[in-house]
Amino acid sequence: MTEADFKIRLFFLVQITNGVFVDFLASVWRHEKSRAVLLQVIVIAAVFGSFGWLISNLVTNFAALNKNFGFDFLFQPAGYDINQRLIEYTNRSTHIRAAVVGLLNTALVAIVGIVLATILGVILGIIRLSNNWLARNVAYWYIEFSRNVPILLHILLWHGIIINTMPHPKKAIAVGDFLFLSNRGLFLPQPIAEVGIAALYLAIVAAFAFVFFFSRYAKKLQRETGRQLPVSIINFIVLISLPLLAFLASGSPVSLDLPALKGFNFRGGMHLMPEFVALTFALSIYTAAFIAEIVRAGILAIHKGQREAAEALGLRPGRVMSLVILPQARRVIIPPLTSQYLNLTKNSSLAIAIGYMDLVATLGGITLNQTGREIETMLLVMSIYLIISLSISVAMNWYNSSVKLVDR
């Protein structure tokens, strides 16, 4: 075979192969499911290719800067103080300890903020539908003002109010001899665990476990037989009596460290910084405005015949709302409510604007600046916020599945 014959045969072979390949692609593209699979394969390949390019670029740049990738810096001394801490911490503690302190501060703001925003949002959502003209319009203007002002301005406003208008410690707003509010923050009694605290913890866990399983049993019994049990009364008695009995039997395993004014400030007790109070108020008030509209929409989604039927049975308006309207409205309220909880948690990262030492201020701020580990610290911050958000979503999805209608 001459070289010319070989080239001719190779040319025809390539043409035939290309034709077969083109026909194959055309047949795949015409088939809907095959086309979907092909597009997904292309997208996945592009994503992994881009990710691989980023990793390669990162390694090259790290080598050029004579830096290495790792998390060993977390075990080095932090060398800075944190103004509010829920666990023991000093400037000699490690960076990972500082990150945990910041994470707990973030979690504290998120939990307290979610509770306050939910309570305020539900109340405002109901008031928005009130027949009282003044109450309805006050709630309306509050919601419109809060929703249309950036959250950062809310935070700065409340911080300025607390710092500049709250009294000095000597003239602090007092509730009895155990709670004080001043421009230095909020001072509360701090519980101190003593010998026998394990029995109290066990009793609390057992009480909540009883409430959970008894409530499910009572609901199942009512659904199958129509018999109603006094669930609220029994649960309340168990929640109070079981821990109380354990407390008394263990010889008072918890003591209180009360705050007391000494000199120019309070000493002892639990100290919540003014930054925490301002941040929590701002996030709660801002998010409550959105929750109020969600609650209002959920109530309006319930057919008016439900209210009319309940009123025809002689139920008072408050009982109609709590027993008939809100239980049904939950199915509409919960999905968007989850988004607001996530927004509140993520908005707490703005705490750095007023000096509250949360996760972003500790791990994503001072630790980053001291160690120069930008990639590692940001990856950790992003991962932690992702875990928190997924945890909230899982909890709310579980609650949503427990209240949704079940098809028979």
Where do the language-model regions lie?
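Transmembrane alpha-helices and adjacent helix-loop boundaries
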Residues: I16-R408
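N-terminal amphipathic/hydrophobic targeting modules at extreme N-termini
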Residues: E3-F12, P150
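Intrinsically disordered, low-complexity regulatory regions of eukaryotic regulatory proteins
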Residues: M1-E3, F21
